[in-house]
Amino acid sequence: ATVVAAGSHSLQIAKELGYGEDMSLLPVAGSFFIADDQLLNGKVYTLQMKKLPFAAVHGDAEVHDDSITRFGPTAKVVPGLERGRLSSVPDFFDVFGFTPEAFLSYANIMADRILLPFVLENLLYDLPVIGRKQFLPHVQKVVPSVELEDIERATGYGGIRPQIVDTANKSLDMGEAKIVGDDIIFNITPSPGASTCLKNAMRDTHTLLESLEGDYEFDEDAFREATIGHFPRADADDDTIAVDAVESAAADD
């Protein structure tokens, strides 16, 4: 039994093994801006547009240094499976497939009157000088007092979110994708963050145990205690907060 959790490359591997033939990817690179000040003590989201599968811009304190507040992500469509690696461009074309269905799917997606302006706008955010100015209004929705000189583009943050393209329906899937094959699972998750990765781990473990026909057991209580048992709680007597963080498999990462 095998779990393939290779990020953007999971679908590439799946295709090489004969799975996911009706799927392609729209790789989306996310960048962040930071403020060298503790402006927030939690995660604050702007309004999510229903038709956009990308996480809404949000602000939160940096995990390793709460004196820094980060805002993002942006969502720039790129022809590669890894951020900053030109060597992953051929990998993207492997996943793309060069089929009529793939070309028609991308054309249909990019012709959308909501998605196309969004994609074009996000191309500006990585540009010197004007990128910061263009992104500032999104930051001010979270913290209205922030000025242009308070933020700068962060380095070393962000990666690639592999958004699934359904080439059969010529559409962009709004969530994560999972291909379950013969004793193998391929995880293609746009945002395998803290809550989503733990939920995936529990779900995949149960699936794998079924294929192992009772030879092994999974102590889910011990798993929860070792992971979400350490999550901060608003009320020390309320265990449901941490559990809900995983059960939701949230899109908040």
Task: Identify what each model region corresponds to.
Residues 212-242:
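Active-site-proximal substrate-binding core of FAD-dependent oxidoreductases
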Residues 56, 114-115, 248:
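Mid-to-C-terminal Rossmann-like scaffold of FAD/NAD(P)H-dependent oxidoreductases
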Residues 40-44, 64, 165-174, 232-242:
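Short, charged low-complexity intrinsically disordered segments located at boundaries
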